[in-house]
Amino acid sequence: MVRWLKLFDHQYFGFWVLGLVLFAIQEIPYMVMPLFHLETNPIMNMVETSAALDVCEKVLGSLCIALMIFVVHEEAVLFSVAEGRERLFFAVAVGVLLLNFFGWGLYFGGNQSVFVMMLFIVVMPPLYYVAIGLWRRNVLLTAVGVVFLVVHFLHVYGNLKA
């Protein structure tokens, strides 16, 4: 992990390679989706109802990924769960990721209800970014992740209900 330029307070522009790995892990369901030959795939075939929300969602989601990889705390190391707070939020991030994977398992198994999609597939990825932000003391990621959660939820729910 490297720090190149101080942004503000204890936040630096840098590079955290595990951020890239954590992003890739969260994307595994999309990588394996073609192997399942789904009869229906509402997540990938939604009718777009709001161009503005679509753009906001894409910008915020991409920003979460960039912030996770390129913003690091002054005292951060490559990987640490030494403090109680770090252990808690790392455990939350792992739990959220596992719930997301559970939801994808339901989805791939044919349970494609709006409830399953919204709870496990839509809500969990932004919460994953928020938990990682809290774990890594990355205030920008945490804040953008919360906004992404709201926009992502409203956008996908509106599309699924169309």
Where does each model-flagged region fall?
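Selected alpha-helical membrane-embedding segments in polytopic membrane proteins
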Residues: 6, 10-76
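Membrane-interface helix-boundary motifs at transmembrane edges
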Residues: 8-11, 74-85, 134-140
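Juxtamembrane "helix-exit" motif on the non-cytosolic side of transmembrane helices
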Residues: 35-40, 102-110, 156-162
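Non-cytosolic membrane-interface motifs at loop->transmembrane helix junctions
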Residues: 45-51, 109-122
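Helix-adjacent hinge/juxtasegments
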Residues: 66-98
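Hydrophobic, membrane-inserted alpha-helices
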Residues: 99-100, 122-132, 148-152
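Membrane-helix boundary connector in multi-pass membrane proteins
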Residues: 105-116, 127-142
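Terminal transmembrane helical module of multi-pass membrane proteins
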Residues: 134-162
